[in-house]
Amino acid sequence: MGAGQSSFVILYHRTPFDESKDKNGKRIWVDQKSPNGIIPTLRNLFRSCEKGTWIAWRRVDDQSNEGTERFEMDNPSPFTLCRIPLEDEQISSFYHITSKECFWPILHTFPTYFNVNNANWKIFEEVNKRFAMAACAEAAEGATVWVHDYNLWLAPGYIRAERPDLKIAFFHHTPFPGNDVFAILPWREQILESLLCCDVVGFHIPRYTENFARAAITLVGAKRGPKVPVDNKFIEVGTALSEGTVTSHL
């Protein structure tokens, strides 16, 4: 696959703006109704890059008749929005069932709520691969691709296989459980091997970093790099989740 033009590519399941129409029926983009600060924070990152792309999904009735939409955005600075067409069945399976019914309880260490019965792993793989291929098509030679959250766990592996020149980062917007809980997932090795294709994997706190490192070492045989002291701001007296040192790399 040939290189694109974007030096910085974000993969996030939601679009940076909601699509609406003005009184004349013309498409307009409005701020997301969600109160969380993730989307405006990510949007502002485009201020510091010359050419950027945001990849998300859009809902369609029949994806065989639809291609990836591309829009040139200008708020807060110019970037390209790419929207991958997904049908209701794909969205329901990939996001609401596999991600929410399977992954969410495990990530938050509530294994009794884990439900794998309705999961369709093939659909999850297909959606992740479509996000990954869209990123590969948009990214310039040596670009940075930043993948967000567990519903795109497999995207880094697909990206690395297709574009080894890219720098891949991943940020986890949830906790990462202990390896004994994470090991409940039937697809644990595939998920970990994909994340290990990243140059950087980020977590909220050092404990989640250590949980990931232990899972990778125990379940797929990753080699632990040196441990480094944790910054004092992450060490609170009496905090059950604190860690004095953290694994620097695998």
Label each residue range with its predicted role.
Residues M1-L250:
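Catalytic cores of carbohydrate-active enzymes across secretory and cytosolic contexts
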